[in-house]
């Protein structure tokens, strides 16, 4: 059994690394951008997270007379959890609160993207324990968009 687990890990590790090579993990959504952000926002609030901002990039572009495919950014977090991390690693404040970007690509597909916890761990020199809560955003998105 341990050999099977090792084989499984060795096979899938490169796939996980490739998915977040640039630090961004993208999850496909079957909903449009507004519905996706609504669902993610509701799931975040249900988990007790604070919504700091919801930025409609495409809406603001339209106000400026520019065209942009639907794109929204949700800024969310938990000050009780994030503040101690930023106290320990002040550079982490550039990436906190957490951000979820939801956009429609050129083919009409909608994606929800976030910074990979492993990327943030490397970027800021976090311990496994410090990085662990940052990885929960993926599960939040997947649960919201199922």
Question: Model features per residue range: what roles?
Answer:
Residues 18-48, 143:
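Terminal, regulation- and interaction-focused segments at domain boundaries
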């Amino acid at each position: 059994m341990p050999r099977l687990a090792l084989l499984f890990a060795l096979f899938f590790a490169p796939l996980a690394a490739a998915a977040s090579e640039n630090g961004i993990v993208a999850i496909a959504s079957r909903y449009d951008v507004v519905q996706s952000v609504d669902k993610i926002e509701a799931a975040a609030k249900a988990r007790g997270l604070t919504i700091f901002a919801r930025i409609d990039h495409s809406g603001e572009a339209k106000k400026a007379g520019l065209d942009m495919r639907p794109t929204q950014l949700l800024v969310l977090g938990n000050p009780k959890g994030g503040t101690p991390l930023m106290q320990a690693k002040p550079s982490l404040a550039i990436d906190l609160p957490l951000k979820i970007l939801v956009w429609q690509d050129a083919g009409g597909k909608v994606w929800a993207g976030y910074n990979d916890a492993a990327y943030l761990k490397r970027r800021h020199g976090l311990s496994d324990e410090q990085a662990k809560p940052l990885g929960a955003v993926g599960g939040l998105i997947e649960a919201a968009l199922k």
